[in-house]
Amino acid sequence: MIGKASRVASSVSALGSVLLTAAGGSAEGRAATPSIFAPVSTPAFAIRELAMFVLGITGVIFVVVAGLGVYVLVRFRRRRGDDRTEPPQVYGSRQIELAWTVVPLLIVAVLFLVTARYIYGVEGHRSREGALEVTVIGHQWWWEIRYPTLGIVTANELHVPVSDAARPTPTFLTVQSADVAHSFWIPQLAGKMDAIPNKTNRLWIEPLQPGTYVGQCAEYCGIQHAGMLLTAVVHSQDEFTRWAAAQQAPARNDGDVQRGRTLFMSLACSSCHTVQGTPGNGVFGPDLTHLMSRATLGAGVMPNSPENLRRWLDNPTALKQGALMPAMKLSPEELNDLTAYLLTLR
């Protein structure tokens, strides 16, 4: 159905492509940013086609209206010796009123029908055998990612397998919120989906090529809305299997960092965070079992490095204003011990 609608829109979309290219940026350049014009997933391709169709129609309207405006300004500009007699008026002209009523109605009707067809094509999919089920929960200001069938809990990184002809593997996302309204959006994979307290929404993606894609919260949710980022990592089928196996393993119990482990369990850390295989089972903050396997800290606001981790433990709000994690007022020795322990959680 999506394919049929795209054929209807193809000629107008071509004009939209020309306008977009003229506006600046190559396809290669756009692919490096979270853009709906660089899709890598089946639903995102449909969204781009619809966007190009709408851009094409509105581009034609702009050219016609702007062209007429320029023509009128030039053709009827004031000249020396102009006849100042009032020209014939067209107020009440039935033909003109019909034209400026019927033409916009036809344009809106076409946009409505094509959009409805795309929406049905994108949202009409239901989970099927072989699909991956993931639950995404928005928090202020981070993302909790759960894989119910795999027993995996992580944060701020969505890992999914690529879908190919040999092994089609769509991913179906259950989107929820633990506090206020958020909106889950990875432009290159799918459209926005609101995360609303006490409500469950569904979204599906079907990535067609491996890679790393950037997303963000698209609904204002407080002081760190702009810092509520996430990353989608699309693996090959075999790489995803290895990633899942590593995430299912319990946390390492390294004897060299026993002081940091004891400190983690004795402070409020274990009341807010979970580390699988330990007494730490808090649910208010991200699961830290494999913290160091993630690329960023603070929901994408900084790279995950030993130095940044130590700075975060020392004073989270200095790095992410409004972060709900309090400063623990640790001594330098305690900071070193706690950092050393967390660095083993891979």
Q: What are the residue ranges of the model-derived segments?
A:
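Short, solvent-exposed mixed-charge patches
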Residues: 2, 345-346
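Alpha-helical transmembrane segments
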Residues: 51-78
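Hydrophobic alpha-helical membrane-insertion segments
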Residues: 13-22, 62, 105-109, 113
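N-terminal secretory/membrane targeting signals
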Residues: 1-31
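Non-transmembrane, membrane-proximal soluble domains of secreted or membrane proteins
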Residues: 28-53, 73-283, 298-321, 326-339
